[in-house]
Amino acid sequence: MAREKEMQEFTRSFFRGRPDLSTLTHSIVRRRYLAHSGRSHLEPEEKQALKRLVEEELLKMQVDEAASREDKLDLTKKGKRPPTPCSDPERKRFRFNSESESGSEASSPDYFGPPAKNGVAAEVSPAKEENPRRASKAVEESSDEERQRDLPAQRGEESSEEEEKGYKGKTRKKPVVKKQAPGKASVSRKQAREESEESEAEPVQRTAKKVEGNKGTKSLKESEQESEEEILAQKKEQREEEVEEEEKEEDEEKGDWKPRTRSNGRRKSAREERSCKQKSQAKRLLGDSDSEEEQKEAASSGDDSGRDREPPVQRKSEDRTQLKGGKRLSGSSEDEEDSGKGEPTAKGSRKMARLGSTSGEESDLEREVSDSEAGGGPQGERKNRSSKKSSRKGRTRSSSSSSDGSPEAKGGKAGSGRRGEDHPAVMRLKRYIRACGAHRNYKKLLGSCCSHKERLSILRAELEALGMKGTPSLGKCRALKEQREEAAEVASLDVANIISGSGRPRRRTAWNPLGEAAPPGELYRRTLDSDEERPRPAPPDWSHMRGIISSDGESN
């Protein structure tokens, strides 16, 4: 309770000093209170309480201003200001004060009224002395803004941010009002002039001045008004950025990011409005006299540019999908996906083009016109070219895919196994085996394989049998080849290895009638020993042939 009382006293004393409401925000009040109380931060409940107290003080200020309006009515009547359709005494009083100060405080407005009115009236006041019609127009605009500003004040259920918009309404409300009719500035100007002429009955001197001003310095005043509106738009943007920063701080506490998106939309509308104004100003400088044409062009420039920008984007997306269709195997379904993707890109390009300058819009329009002029025959040629390209690419793609296709398709064709051996992975493993110093008959080794996966597994097994460990590489293969050559050399030099080893089969004797193969050790010993120790073979037995052949040619 003590802290709440302290906050209440602080807000009362703070608003008694009449602060500048056009730049005042909740975060500024919070910082001032922290500096006043000497604390580093506030709790969320304290922040809400401080917001509520600030809103109460603002409502009290409005009540006090309503009481002081009646006193100021006499002053504005004495100042001989022309009566306006919406004669707000508070606005009249402020205009009187600003003119008495001779426009010196245009940038820092008086603090007797809400900031939405003050910003408009203070910036338009130097032009009012030269052109009373402009003054009446500014007053009408501000009266519309006040009507919109009073709505959130009447609704007590709305959030504190929306009430803050109502009190500091210029930063939020004015872009929305202008968004409703961005290209109808000249129409509102005419209406304002007609109403001001009907209402101005008494001063004859002022009407004469108006006629002179209209005849002599019409173009100069219009250019001045345009420059003033540009300054207003710049100030609006600055204030919008400040309000966005506050919203970010508050949203970080609450976790709600919706207001920021709203303010971004308003900033877009303000930029669109500024681009329309620049167009209309350029046309006036060039000397376009027809005001109706200006209205039509300004009103339809945004919509037409958005509408005309669609066909080139769609055409580009169609060409892209046609080119992609030849490269891919499944054409129609992926074309639909591509066209679906093309729509959001078209929307995004439309948004960027709206935010861009008028030169970008004109270049887009020229491009669209050139595309539409070059339509018909050239477009058909383009489509024919793209279809030819896609058919060519489809042929090459189908041939390569058939080479890498399923094993069933390969089994039905002649020489399909040979094509499988040309697979890059198979060729690489063959090169590794060759680098290891081994030579294999791949026709026998890979003849029974149906797919390149089987070939790869067989070749990897061969590499492992040769002694390859891990992923094969040419460096490992060279090292393995050296090891194998070294082992072969050692084996050839080892005598015991030669005798016992089963190398290439050699023919030791022409024919052994006994059918007994002599052991290899016996053969080696026979060559080393002397002739005496060699066993003699038994003499042949010819007894069974004695009756057939006799030595003397006679038979018994």
From Swiss-Prot:
Phosphorylated by CK2. The modification Phosphothreonine is found at T84, T358, T471. GO terms for cellular component: nucleolus; nucleoplasm; nucleus. Residues 99-108 have a biased composition (Low complexity). Residues 168-177, 260-269, 385-396 have a biased composition (Basic residues). It is found in: Nucleus. Transmembrane segments: none annotated. Interacts (via C-terminus) with histone H2A-H2B dimers; the interaction is direct. Interacts with HIRA. Interacts with CK2. Histone chaperone that carries a H2A-H2B histone complex and facilitates its deposition onto chromatin. This is HIRA-interacting protein 3. It comes from Homo sapiens (Human). The lineage of its organism: Eukaryota, Metazoa, Chordata, Craniata, Vertebrata.
